[in-house]
Curated annotation (Swiss-Prot):
CDD domains, sorted: RuBisCO_large_I
DNA repair in keyword set: no
Name recorded for this polypeptide: Ribulose bisphosphate carboxylase large chain
Annotated source species: Chlamydomonas moewusii
Residue list for modification N6-carboxylysine: K201
Xref: InterPro entries: RuBisCO, RuBisCo_large_chain_AS, RuBisCO_lsu_C, RuBisCO_lsu_C_sf, RuBisCO_lsu_fd_N, RuBisCO_lsu_N_sf, RuBisCO_lsuI
Biological role stated in the UniProt entry: RuBisCO catalyzes two reactions: the carboxylation of D-ribulose 1,5-bisphosphate, the primary event in carbon dioxide fixation, as well as the oxidative fragmentation of the pentose substrate in the photorespiration process. Both reactions occur simultaneously and in competition at the same active site.
Active site: K175 (proton acceptor), H294 (proton acceptor)
Single GO molecular function: magnesium ion binding
């Protein structure tokens, strides 16, 4: 037998309570390439040292508990314990610290986001010695990344499937989100797609309600897709929300979508759960379906600056769990999102290798080992006047979704879609010609209005609409 390595917690067992920092605060620790690293924003209770809080976070999210236990001597804590290896004060904040914790890779089940989160963001967030705790970032080492399949297809395969290159994709969430019959819903989908959109979308809370059962919606939306494709010669899609009360029902809906021949389905990954999401992602990969991911419930988790989980962590988790699209905020619309922070996690969704950059909130260098990227989706309170900023911010590999900004057009859904398509192509062309959309975007839109009455009408309706509030979660 291999002799056990004694640790301070296991040497000469003596019942009682010890400071966490005696075992779990190790400022001399050298981080391993295989360690999973976490950056926590801590707010200790008055009188509690930051080192004790950091050690408590490391302990309670790995091998530790509130008292010494004799079974510590039956394993090697040096091998399995989490370690708080650095603490730094948060500039400009009283009594807030960033605690860096390293976790041995063997603490986590391969390919399981559920197990990863159960440990790292589990009971420790209710720990009394902490007034507040927020997980700001994770470093997922290549050795652990390779245990995940990631997105079903990824950005490049999606473009190949729908045969669309050189510009962002256009979408629209059908409104009103609740209350339409399946046939009227399908009619709205058809009008938007024939007008020039690439995709339309179920809202996140459209599942299978009495006014519109899921199978009826799937059928009429599939009919709308085929009709619009025949008229336009373009590949079209509608994000059919397969989210359901059970995983079995969710897969049944995905099977139906596949049988109807539609290209893409949808899941609410936070309310549905990581286990269900990974199962659905695996089905989509095996059966050629794209998977659009909505982040409903995210703001409950990520919006407060000092407690919860930052969205960059939730975005990394989705990339591992699996999804081809993910809602990521707009910067310019009605939903929360600071520019540099948003661009930081958009890069974490799309790119293979992202350097540490604290100016964008990225605490660790992340290597995705060629895992397929996730296309960011900008949605929420945007309209044609926002198009130059959206193209400048997100580039081509993004889906820009205008719900009210399409369906609110004074002439109807199809003209609303035309207006958005014209605006997108005008801004893309202007950017490709070297024009500065940040400065000249308004001129680009006004020029395009001269040969698109649909765009001119949209610009007149929304010329005074702005959503300007301070961002709560700032760097």
């Amino acid at each position: 037998m291999v002799p056990q390595t004694e640790t301070k917690a296991g040497a000469g067992f003596k019942a009682g309570v010890k400071d966490y920092r005696l075992t779990y605060y190790t400022p001399d620790y050298v981080v391993k390439d295989t360690d999973i690293l976490a950056a926590f924003r801590m707010t200790p209770q008055p009188g509690v040292p930051a080192e004790e809080c950091g050690a408590a976070v490391a302990a309670e999210s790995s091998t530790g508990t509130w008292t010494t236990v004799w079974t510590d001597g039956l394993t090697s804590l040096d091998r399995y314990k989490g370690r708080c290896y650095d603490i730094e004060p948060v500039p400009g904040e009283d009594n807030q610290y960033i605690a860096y914790v390293a976790y041995p890779i063997d603490l986590f089940e391969e390919g399981s986001v559920t197990n990863l989160f159960t440990s790292i963001v589990g009971n420790v967030f209710g720990f009394k010695a902490l007034r507040a705790l927020r997980l700001e970032d994770l470093r997922i080492p290549p050795a652990y990344v390779k245990t995940f399949s990631g997105p079903p297809h990824g950005i490049q395969v999606e473009r190949d499937k729908i045969n669309k290159y050189g510009r962002g994709l256009l979408g629209c969430t059908i409104k009103p989100k609740l209350g339409l019959s399946a046939k009227n819903y399908g009619r709205a989908v058809y009008e938007c797609l024939r007008g020039g959109l690439d995709f339309t979308k179920d809202d996140e809370n459209v599942n299978s309600q009495p006014f519109m059962r899921w199978r009826d919606r799937f059928l009429f939306c599939a009919e709308a897709i085929y009709k619009a494709q025949a008229e336009t010669g373009e590949v079209k899609g509608h994000y059919l929300n397969a989210t359901a009360g059970t995983s079995e029902e969710m897969i049944k809906r995905a099977v139906c979508a596949k049988e109807f021949g539609v290209p893409i389905i949808m899941h609410d990954y936070l309310t549905g759960g990581f286990t269900a999401n990974t199962s659905l992602s695996n089905y989509c990969r095996d059966h050629g379906l794209l998977l659009h991911i909505h982040r409903a419930m995210h703001a409950v988790i990520d919006r407060q600056r000092n407690h919860g989980i930052h969205f960059r962590v939730l975005a990394k988790a989705l990339r591992m769990s699996g999804g081809d699209h993910l809602h990521s905020g707009t910067v310019v619309g009605k939903l929360e999102g600071e520019r540099e922070v948003t661009l930081g996690f958009v890069d974490l969704m799309r790119d293979n290798y992202i350097e540490k950059d604290r100016s964008r909130g990225i605490y660790f260098t992340q290597d995705w080992c060629s895992m397929a990227g996730v296309m960011p989706v900008a949605s929420g309170g945007i309209h044609v006047w926002h198009m130059p900023a959206l193209v400048e911010i997100f580039g081509d590999d993004a889906c820009l979704q205008f719900g009210g900004g399409t369906l609110g057009h004074p002439w109807g859904n199809a003209p609303g879609a035309v207006a958005n398509r014209v605006a997108l192509e005008a801004c893309t062309q202007a950017r490709n010609e070297g024009r500065d959309l940040a400065r000249e975007g308004g001129d680009v839109i006004r020029s395009a209005c001269k040969w698109s009455p649909e765009l001119a009408a949209a610009c007149e309706v929304w010329k005074e609409i702005k959503v300007e509030f301070d961002t709560i979660d700032k760097l």
